[in-house]
Amino acid sequence: MEDKVFIQLRNVNKTFDDGFVAVRNLNLDINKSEFVTLLGPSGCGKTTTLKLLAGFEQPTYGQIKINGIDIKDMPVHKRPFATVFQDYALFPNMTVYNNVCYGLKIMRVPKENTDPKLAVEAENIKKEAEKKAAAKIKDLSRKKNDLSNKLDKIRKEYEKNDWMLENDEMRFAQYQEELIKLEAQLSEAYEQSEINKLNQEIVELKTNYQKKIPIDNRYDKVLKELENADGWTSYWETYPIMKKEHFENKVLTRRLTKKEIEERANNMIKLVGLTGKEDKYPSELSGGMQQRVALARALVIEPETLLLDEPLSALDAKVRKQLQNELKRIHKELNITFILVTHDQEEALSLSDKIVVMSQGDIEQVGKPNAIYDSPINEWTAKFIGAANIFDGKYLGDYKIELNSGDIIDTDEEYEFKKGDNVRVLIRPEDFDVVEKDQGFFNVEVIKTSYKGVLWEVECLMSDKTKIKVDNIDEVKVGAIVGLKFDEMDVHMMRKEEEDV
């Protein structure tokens, strides 16, 4: 795999008209030929991020770079992407073969035996366009700098009022939502002290928001101007490429021949396992087969990147597993960049070279699957990515941790932790070994067992009444006192969140 940055997202933000921030100052590098998964719960911003890449949504601000060039102003059909959707989006009146051929009929390839002077002319057109673009970008850079300074001055006005600073992103929709919530609480309040408190909060909300409105209006106006200037910067960055491409399409490229279309379509149909289904209509196919058609239609036009928007979520477990294996195989064979959106942790862990864990519009952690699973950066990621036992403890130094139960355990990691730091400790259920009483690092009482088909899920109680879950091959009797062992490498420390300290 090429270790070369291909796609860069820089300070990408998407705020909708109602004030909802779907993606917040997102920064991400994606390498050429990498299989990257955007993983997170519903509403975390992963699908919005994919739409921003594809061009179906425009960022409020920020840069989306391909090979160093900001493409956020580039039309959808000009971007080096193809998208596979969750609902397949097949043409119901076309056969499998015609669905796959659809993009090939407008695809262009280089002409053979062209005059070399035409290629030189194309480069000259690009160079002239680059000169023009450079001058425009320079002017826009000065304008953006002035606008950024204006925004900084307006931000300082928010800082004069603690309420405004805390609620700087609040606009009318959020204000109404907060007001309705407080009024609903007031209508249900009985005690006079609570009624007085809520009335005071409502008065403060109304007063502070009225003071904030003129500042918001000035801020939003300048921000809009900055976004517009940023959009034009993106336009001029892609301008030389577009000018060259326009010339090449007229004199240096051609449409595919009927024979070439047939050959490419048949090869792709074979690659995705649709041989024999060419004359079927989508309505005659299972969900899994329809998704294969959607995959073939996207890949046949030879995109540099394939965007996958939860393509397997509507399929049953068996078919989903089969298609996961197919995706992995196809990615390996084609060696192009795949970007997958999913909420399925197992899917992300099994398919990805890199996982991007998202929550509430922010990136929580980026890393290889094993790093995300074994060394999550915080408790939220640890619990989201898989079953997790989280203990409170104190780092004693010398790779030793004292749990709140009083038990002292070893770890093989230290990172930035110092002696005396309060920590969260992660041990996955599968990392425990059940042994005889007093033969482990500490004893626990078995309070519940459940057979999961391959392993027993054993729920235990520690001496400080902390509940933990253990995966075990053999059944353990409820009420038994057993010992638990684990390897030092399976003990992962996380910093305590500020509100927990």
From Swiss-Prot:
It is found in: Cell membrane. This is Spermidine/putrescine import ATP-binding protein PotA. GO terms for cellular component: plasma membrane. Residues 7-385 form the ABC transporter domain. The complex is composed of two ATP-binding proteins (PotA), two transmembrane proteins (PotB and PotC) and a solute-binding protein (PotD). SUPFAM superfamilies: MOP-like (SSF50331), P-loop containing nucleoside triphosphate hydrolases (SSF52540). Part of the ABC transporter complex PotABCD involved in spermidine/putrescine import. Responsible for energy coupling to the transport system. Its EC number is 7.6.2.11. It catalyses: ATP + H2O + polyamine-[polyamine-binding protein]Side 1 = ADP + phosphate + polyamineSide 2 + [polyamine-binding protein]Side 1. Residues 108-254 are annotated as: Insert. It is an enzyme of class 7 (translocase). Pfam families: ABC_tran (PF00005). GO terms for molecular function: ABC-type polyamine transporter activity; ATP binding; ATP hydrolysis activity. Belongs to the ABC transporter superfamily. Spermidine/putrescine importer (TC 3.A.1.11.1) family. Its main location: membrane. Keywords: ATP-binding, Cell membrane, Membrane, Nucleotide-binding, Translocase, Transport. It is a peripheral membrane protein. The gene is potA. ATP binds at G40, P41, S42, G43, C44, G45, K46, T47.
